[in-house]
């Protein structure tokens, strides 16, 4: 392998590594955003003045109409 080929391989390898590092950082930022959104939702739930009700059952709601 010539010196020129080694230099080209090194350059391409550096480009690949840089691209993968950028992708990894983007994923970390996305995970951070999701975690922050979850934390915000959790804090909103903690300050609600009433507990959330259980989901309504269709039959319980419409039973009088049967």
Swiss-Prot record:
Keyword Oxidoreductase: no
Domain of life the protein comes from: Eukaryota
A GO CC term attached to the entry: extracellular region
Modification after translation: Proteolytically cleaved on its way through the secretory system, probably within the Golgi lumen. Proteolytic cleavage is not necessary for its chaperone activity. All non-secreted forms are not proteolytically cleaved. Chaperone activity of uncleaved forms is dependent on a non-reducing environment. Polyubiquitinated, leading to proteasomal degradation. Under cellular stress, the intracellular level of cleaved form is reduced due to proteasomal degradation.
Topology with respect to the bilayer: Peripheral membrane protein
Subcellular location: Secreted; Nucleus; Cytoplasm; Mitochondrion membrane
Alphabetical UniProt keywords: Chaperone, Cytoplasm, Cytoplasmic vesicle, Disulfide bond, Endoplasmic reticulum, Glycoprotein, Membrane, Microsome, Mitochondrion, Nucleus, Secreted, Ubl conjugation
GO biological process, one term: positive regulation of receptor-mediated endocytosis
Main subcellular location: secreted
Gene Ontology molecular functions: unfolded protein binding
Family, as annotated: Belongs to the clusterin family.
Complex formation: Antiparallel disulfide-linked heterodimer of an alpha chain and a beta chain. Self-associates and forms higher oligomers. Interacts with a broad range of misfolded proteins, including APP, APOC2 and LYZ. Slightly acidic pH promotes interaction with misfolded proteins. Forms high-molecular weight oligomers upon interaction with misfolded proteins. Interacts with APOA1, LRP2, CLUAP1 and PON1. Interacts with the complement membrane attack complex. Interacts (via alpha chain) with XRCC6.
Functional summary from the UniProt entry: Functions as extracellular chaperone that prevents aggregation of non native proteins. Prevents stress-induced aggregation of blood plasma proteins. Inhibits formation of amyloid fibrils by APP, APOC2, B2M, CALCA, CSN3, SNCA and aggregation-prone LYZ variants (in vitro). Does not require ATP. Maintains partially unfolded proteins in a state appropriate for subsequent refolding by other chaperones, such as HSPA8/HSC70. Does not refold proteins by itself.
Name used for this protein in its record: Clusterin
Organism: Ovis aries
